[in-house]
UniProtKB/Swiss-Prot annotation:
One of its GO terms (cellular component) is membrane. Gene3D superfamilies: MFS general substrate transporter like domains. It is found in: Cell membrane. The lineage of its organism: Eukaryota, Fungi, Dikarya, Ascomycota, Pezizomycotina. NCBIfam families: SP. This is Quinate permease. The keyword Transport applies. Belongs to the major facilitator superfamily. Sugar transporter (TC 2.A.1.1) family. Integral membrane transporter that imports quinic acid to be catabolized as a carbon source. Its main location: membrane. It comes from Emericella nidulans (strain FGSC A4 / ATCC 38163 / CBS 112.46 / NRRL 194 / M139) (Aspergillus nidulans).
Length: 533
């Protein structure tokens, strides 16, 4: 099998790869547009002279204030990810998305009331509420997409979540360049970027009213008829089609196995997480993936991009904003390639390994240049020398390695590697761990740059090297594996051969199942499907 082949667990009718699955993923991914925009715009907005003048920036401890404004958002997101578990369990994925959008909308609206007379209090409070909203969304959105996605393109569809993140990021990075170029320094100049947060939240509120509920959640809650009806609509197939019969059978078998082993109640997954070593082990793996993701330095760059580029030698407000905007565009373009091709063809594991290796080399080079040339000491307006241009090149090359690997892939893996009855709790833990590591990195990044200088780049480069060892020995490939077979996948050893072993077994079982169906007369297997098998 080619390393770039699209992996199907069984012959899949073309109707399954239809516009409906992409539409549902796109609507749900307005969640990530909120996250991407918020993470991108805040650092550059804080660097606008109009914002600093209105809040008398020079009289404040700017490192502390910047860190607080950024990190309160992550603190809210940590708790939002946990609060989303009962919402997703009892009310469903669709209403969970609605909840996240409403809370974010409220927080974004609160920030618009801030000004020099009122101080930063409304921004602090709004950041916490917005964080709760995006934390809840970061839990529910990947689950929703993975539960309705066909296995062969599940990575691509969950990747739409990441694409939304990058689209929001591009707008967030460029909007401050736009207002800085076109508007005089004023309250209006810096409040516009805050107001734009309302747009993706409003679109998600409208979209959540129109999309279908997750069929797997409907099965989990005992609403079998509605689950079959919804699944048939999403797959664009009649309920008695052989592909549908197989999928319904797999869902119900998985739920029955989990009912026997764990139970289906609200508290059962908590008990399973602490008593079932397999689940606890995968929770550990999911949390560690987000440690390594944040350990790459991405959020230090996202939230404090003007300072990052200044450390390389990029000076001048507009120049820094422009360089930051280009960084956002590079990420978005590469994410599009990752989404359309790499995640489901090259695979999750291979992307993580290659991205960590290449990204680490780039950060060592950038840090080495800063250590030798000390560009942060250059006078304002100094042109980049050849070394500085090379450092910028390797920074963008780091972006090219990081974006299609560690940026979205941990979200894909966490959304798919747990059984249905613990998936909501597991994703809550995974999302919360992401925001915890995100908080720790973003809270102390300003102090790290002040005290460590070039050492910050060496620190992140070293963590990327360690992530290679972690992935190689502990993370199996998951592309094309049905959600109901993930426990079997993680049981197989060695890890680097687990995927090929499982796919071979699944195809053998599928052939036997279809042969039995044909012999019993319960389902027709067309010649086309037999030949594909």
């Amino acid at each position: 099998m080619s390393i770039l082949a699209l992996v199907e667990d069984r012959p899949t009718p073309r109707e399954v790869y239809n516009w409906r699955v992409y539409l549902l993923a796109a609507v749900a991914s307005f969640t990530s547009c909120m996250i991407g925009y918020d993470s991108a715009f805040i650092g550059t907005t804080l660097s606008l002279q109009s914002f600093q003048n209105e809040f008398n920036w020079e009289s404040l401890n700017t490192d502390l204030i910047s860190a607080n404004i950024v990190s309160l958002y992550q603190a809210g997101a940590f708790f939002g990810a946990l609060f989303a578990y009962p919402i997703g369990h009892f009310w469903g994925r669709r209403w969970g998305l609605m909840f996240s959008a409403l809370i974010f909308f409220l927080g974004a609206g609160m920030m618009l009331g801030a000004n020099g007379d009122r101080g930063l209090g409304l921004i602090y409070g709004g950041r916490v509420l917005a964080g709760i909203g995006v934390g809840a969304g970061s839990n529910i959105c990947p689950i929703y997409i993975s539960e309705m996605a066909p296995p062969a393109i599940r990575g691509r569809l969950v990747g739409v979540y990441e694409l939304g993140w990058q689209i929001g990021g591009v707008v967030g990075f460029w909007i401050n360049y736009g207002v800085d170029e076109t508007l005089a320094p004023s309250h209006k100049q810096w409040i516009i970027p805050f107001a734009v947060q309302l747009i993706p939240a409003g679109l998600l509120i409208i979209g959540a009213l129109l999309i279908r509920e997750s069929p797997r959640w409907l099965f989990l809650r005992g609403n079998r008829e509605k689950g079959i009806e919804t699944l048939a609509w999403i797959r664009n197939l009649p309920a008695d089609h052989i592909y549908m019969v197989e999928e319904i059978n797999m869902i119900e078998q998985s739920l029955e196995q989990q009912r026997v082993k764990i139970g289906l109640g609200f508290w059962k997954p908590f008990k399973a997480a602490w008593t079932n070593k397999r689940i606890l082990y995968r929770l550990f793996l999911g949390s560690m993936l987000f440690l390594w993701q944040n350990g790459s330095g991405i959020n230090a760059i996202n939230y404090y991009s003007p300072r990052v580029f200044k450390s390389i030698g990029v000076s001048g407000g507009n120049t820094s904003l422009l360089t930051t905007g280009i960084f956002g565009v590079v990420k978005a373009v590469i994410t599009f390639v990752w989404l359309l091709y790499l995640i489901d063809h090259f695979g999750r594991r291979n992307l993580l390994l290659v991205g960590a290796a290449g990204g680490s080399v780039c950060l060592w080079i950038v840090g080495g240049y800063i250590k030798i040339a000390k560009p942060e000491n250059n006078p304002e307006g100094t042109q980049l020398d050849s070394g500085g241009i090379a450092a910028i090149f390797f920074f963008y090359l780091w972006t090219a390695f990081y974006t299609p690997s560690w940026n979205g892939t941990p979200w894909v893996i966490n959304s798919e590697m747990f059984d249905p009855t613990v998936r909501s709790l597991a994703q809550a833990c995974a999302a919360a761990s992401n925001w915890l590591w995100n908080f720790l990195i973003s809270r102390f990044t300003p102090q790290m740059f002040t005290s460590m200088g070039y050492g910050v780049y060496f620190f992140f480069a070293s963590l990327m090297i360690l992530s290679i060892v972690f992935v190689f020995f502990l993370i199996p490939e998951t592309k094309g594996v049905p959600l109901e077979s993930m426990e079997t996948l993680f049981d197989k050893k060695p890890v680097w051969h687990a995927h090929s072993q499982l796919i071979r077994e699944l195809r053998e079982n599928e052939e036997a199942f279809r042969a039995d169906m044909g012999a019993s007369g319960k389902g027709g297997v067309t010649k086309e499907y037999v030949e594909e098998a």
